[in-house]
């Protein structure tokens, strides 16, 4: 029976297998990007992480790594953009807000830095990093 399936069956993969392949490809791209980031191959890390985000834009961990790669390559506006998207998804994350403030400071955008610091202080005024 398998012979007839192989000869006359359709060549398309089942939806479950396609989804499995997409998930595997996403994970490969994500972790290749993380590895490249740790090895200080920032351009390759950016390429991998951008493709991973194209596959799954809801993954905030990829955006975090991408922002780190952008900061390392001095693409501060793009790093700030990724951090803004992360802050929209989880507005109560102090670490994201602090990194946004750092990037705004590096861009010499002091009004944006002050706004982000105010948000962070509203969330946790006792935090010494804020």
What are these regions, as identified by a protein language model?
Residues 1-12:
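Polybasic, Ser/Thr-rich amphipathic helices
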Residues 19-55, 61, 65, 71-72, ...:
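Alpha-helical segment of the N-proximal tetratricopeptide repeat
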Residues 51-54, 84-88, 118-122:
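Conserved structural position within tetratricopeptide repeats
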Residues 25-27, 60-61, 94-95, 127-129:
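Helix-start (N-cap) detector for alpha-helical repeat units in TPR-like alpha-solenoids
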């Amino acid at each position: 029976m398998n012979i007839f399936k192989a000869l006359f069956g359709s060549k398309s993969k089942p939806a479950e297998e396609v989804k499995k392949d997409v998930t595997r490809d996403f994970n490969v791209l994500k972790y290749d990007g993380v590895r490249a980031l740790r090895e200080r191959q920032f351009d390759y890390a950016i390429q991998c992480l951008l493709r991973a985000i194209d596959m799954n834009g809801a993954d905030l961990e990829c955006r975090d790594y991408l922002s780190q790669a952008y900061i390392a390559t001095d693409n501060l506006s793009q790093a700030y953009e990724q951090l803004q998207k992360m802050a929209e998804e989880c507005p109560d994350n102090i670490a994201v807000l602090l990194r946004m403030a750092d990037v705004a400071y590096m861009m010499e955008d002091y009004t944006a830095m002050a706004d982000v610091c105010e948000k962070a202080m509203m969330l946790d005024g006792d935090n010494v990093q804020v």
